[in-house]
């Protein structure tokens, strides 16, 4: 079967931003103007095509990354609409991993918000080229150039406006295209009748000034363009387009567009810019991976290369389990067998589909550069690599943030226990930041996630999709433990029962690991003092012991262990004996290494009228918060701070009462930090009292 669109005419893009910037409305308009939908769906009416979960339509927020295919100017555009709420940051993370370009949507009034910075960092982590759409130019207080300044200052991006709005707020009537040096005037409310004209005389001077700035910025990205610019005093339209595109692909330039998706202005120009400036799969570096030999390798974005794909999302679906994949190389055929190289398991491809939100089109094959979904996979989860059985490779996986909040959950009736277990397994398969465990002391089922809204929506889904009514306990903070110094640890396990004994002996050196490294094990046993077959069990014993630290039973992180010595017995030694000895050595070492308790710190930004600033700062300080910055703009104070999650429960209610309902705040995970001694002692004694 021939390819419907050549690779250079494919764009895999994401639409990302902070909550309420208008991402989903922008996506809806893209689908309307490109002919996928024939009437406009509004988020606030609960009719958006990409918001297809019941809770999304009710709450007017996007929870999951919906993938949709459309076409524009003879190009295939695969779009992922991502959530802006911080509790669903994994959805943004996994979509960034598989995208080639991003449209970052900003509100013309709110500008750069804390969640905008998070999304920007995620795009940086995966080196995703991007452009900016400043939306909501029809709103009171809209200011395109203020957002431009914020993007340069707060995101440190080389932003370059390639458009200017004609009018603003209620008077937004059109858009100046600085590249073509023309104005686009909107003649009807649907945004389908657009007249291209000369730039209005009252804006000619401003447009000339910004066009000159654009030429200068673009010329700086390329030596040939600099020469041409210095020689001729300007760049041609073709040179401008080529320079902007190259600047975007090299991450040296971020073009800025403007409009109002809700008022149907500017969206077709966004689509034109996606094609002109964002990369095709062949414009980005080939995906990197590791061969079975341990050697690094790459897979070029070509149909005739060996097949490789990354599973970036798993979803329970009325038709069975849907696994979303990004095709990196080769061709995937319906009915074929492939290798899950992450788990070393064979999988059969039952059916292949391309999605238009909750509508799907069955296809016989997916090709390099495509985004699609597979039915029939049994063992594949988020972040796994699928590849050809003849040419195995493991692709770079996803970064998954640790959950920061947990609650106990139990079914309302005993008969629902099995249904609850199935629901939790299914939800955990879909969402890597949702963890399920059993509390060893109380035997309760504990679920953990990225925030209160995250867990609330998952509990809601249990009821809607799995018909399980559950009781939820009070939220608990996910503390961690780590070590601050180095020491040796020793574990000797020797038992004599009847004829056969048990013997294992392990000596380790322990030291703090790099932040984010988790548990790191190095084997330095020489001369066979401990046989190879016992090293793995000893390491496993230590890794399992990490799950429950010595202070208060919280997981131990960022620990580096080197096994340096030990002994064994020809007859009595066994894998189990060395697993126990490894665990004993680990516990012995941790106690000598100055163990400390860590807590999740949250980045909290509060916006309040100026009059309330003093009481807000006082309240944050009483919550062990550290104020890191503040600013005042038009009588509204913004306070940036870092506050322990443990002190933030119920903050929304408190803020409402302190500001008479006029304050808003956003919160996202920052990092784990050491708990002050007096607070740590209270947590430890409470946990030891419960055990």
Swiss-Prot record:
Keywords: Cytoplasm, Elongation factor, GTP-binding, Nucleotide-binding, Protein biosynthesis. InterPro entries: EFG_II, EFG_III, EFG_III/V, EFG_IV, EFG_V, EFG_V-like, EFTu-like_2, G_TR_CS. The keyword Nucleotide-binding applies. GO terms for molecular function: GTP binding; GTPase activity; translation elongation factor activity. Transmembrane segments: none annotated. Catalyzes the GTP-dependent ribosomal translocation step during translation elongation. During this step, the ribosome changes from the pre-translocational (PRE) to the post-translocational (POST) state as the newly formed A-site-bound peptidyl-tRNA and P-site-bound deacylated tRNA move to the P and E sites, respectively. Catalyzes the coordinated movement of the two tRNA molecules, the mRNA and conformational changes in the ribosome. This is Elongation factor G.
């Amino acid at each position: 079967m021939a390819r419907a669109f050549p690779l250079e005419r494919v764009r895999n893009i994401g639409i990302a931003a902070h909550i309420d910037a208008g991402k989903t409305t922008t996506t809806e308009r893209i689908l309307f103007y490109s002919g996928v939908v024939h009437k406009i769906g509004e988020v606030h009416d609960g009719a958006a095509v990409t918001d297809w979960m019941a809770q999304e339509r009710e709450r007017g927020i996007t929870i999951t990354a919906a993938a949709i295919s459309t076409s524009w100017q003879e190009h295939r555009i695969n779009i992922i609409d991502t959530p802006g709420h911080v509790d669903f940051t994994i959805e943004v993370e996994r979509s960034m991993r598989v995208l080639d370009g991003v449209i970052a949507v900003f509100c013309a009034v709110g500008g750069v918000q804390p969640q905008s910075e998070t999304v920007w960092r995620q795009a940086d982590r995966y080196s995703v080229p991007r452009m900016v759409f400043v939306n909501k130019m029809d709103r009171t207080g809209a200011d395109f150039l203020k957002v431009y300044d914020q993007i340069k200052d707060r995101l440190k991006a080389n932003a370059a406006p390639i458009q200017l709005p004609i009018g603003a707020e209620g008077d937004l009537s059109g858009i100046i295209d600085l590249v073509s040096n023309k104005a686009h005037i909107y003649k009807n409310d649907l945004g389908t009748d657009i007249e291209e004209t000369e730039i209005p005389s009252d804006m000619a001077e401003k447009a000339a000034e910004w066009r000159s700035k654009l030429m200068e910025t673009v010329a700086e990205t390329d030596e040939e363009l600099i020469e041409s610019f210095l020689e001729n005093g300007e760049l041609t339209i073709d040179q401008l387009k080529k320079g902007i595109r190259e600047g975007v692909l090299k991450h040296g330039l971020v073009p800025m567009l403007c409009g109002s998706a809700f008022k149907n202005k500017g969206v077709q120009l966004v689509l034109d810019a996606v094609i002109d400036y964002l990369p095709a799969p062949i414009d980005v570096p080939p995906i990197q991976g590791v061969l079975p030999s341990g050697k690094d390798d790459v897979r070029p974005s070509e149909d005739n290369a060996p097949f490789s794909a990354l599973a970036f999302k798993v979803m329970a679906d009325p038709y069975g389990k849907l696994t979303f994949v990004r095709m990196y190389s080769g061709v995937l055929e319906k009915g074929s067998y492939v290798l899950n190289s992450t788990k070393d398991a064979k999988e059969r491809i039952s059916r292949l589909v391309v999605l238009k939100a909750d509508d799907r089109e069955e296809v016989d094959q997916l090709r390099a550069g495509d985004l699609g979904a597979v039915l029939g996979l049994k063992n594949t989860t988020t972040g796994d690599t699928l590849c050809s059985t003849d040419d195995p490779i493991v692709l770079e996986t996803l970064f998954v943030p640790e959950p920061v909040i947990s609650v106990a959950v139990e079914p309302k009736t005993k008969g629902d226990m099995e249904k609850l277990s199935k629901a939790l397994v299914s939800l955990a398969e879909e969402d890597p930041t949702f963890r399920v465990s059993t509390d060893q002391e109380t035997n309760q089922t504990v679920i953990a996630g990225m925030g209160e809204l995250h867990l609330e929506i998952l509990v809601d889904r249990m009821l809607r999709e799995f018909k399980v009514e559950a009781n939820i306990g009070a939220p608990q903070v996910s503390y961690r433990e780590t070590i601050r110094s180095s020491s040796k640890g020793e574990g000797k396990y020797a038992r004599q029962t009847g004829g056969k004994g048990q013997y294992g002996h392990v000596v380790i050196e322990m030291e703090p690991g790099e932040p984010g490294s988790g548990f790191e094990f190095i084997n330095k046993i020489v001369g066979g003092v401990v046989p190879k077959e016992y090293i793995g069990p000893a390491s496993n014993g230590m890794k399992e012991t990490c799950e429950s630290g010595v202070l208060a039973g919280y997981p131990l992180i960022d620990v580096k262990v080197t096994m340096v010595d030990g002994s064994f017995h020809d007859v009595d030694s066994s894998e189990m004996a060395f697993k126990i000895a490894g665990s004993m050595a680990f516990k012995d070492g941790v106690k000598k290494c100055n163990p400390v308790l860590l807590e999740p710190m949250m980045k909290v930004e509060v916006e309040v009228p100026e009059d309330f600033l003093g009481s807000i700062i006082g309240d944050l300080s009483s919550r062990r918060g550290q104020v890191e910055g503040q600013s005042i703009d038009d009588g509204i104070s913004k306070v940036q701070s870092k506050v322990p999650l443990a002190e933030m429960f119920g903050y929304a209610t408190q803020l409402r009462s302190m500001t008479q309902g006029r304050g808003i705040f956003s919160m996202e995970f920052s990092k784990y930090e050491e708990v002050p001694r007096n607070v740590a002692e209270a947590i430890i004694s409470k946990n030891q009292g419960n055990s």
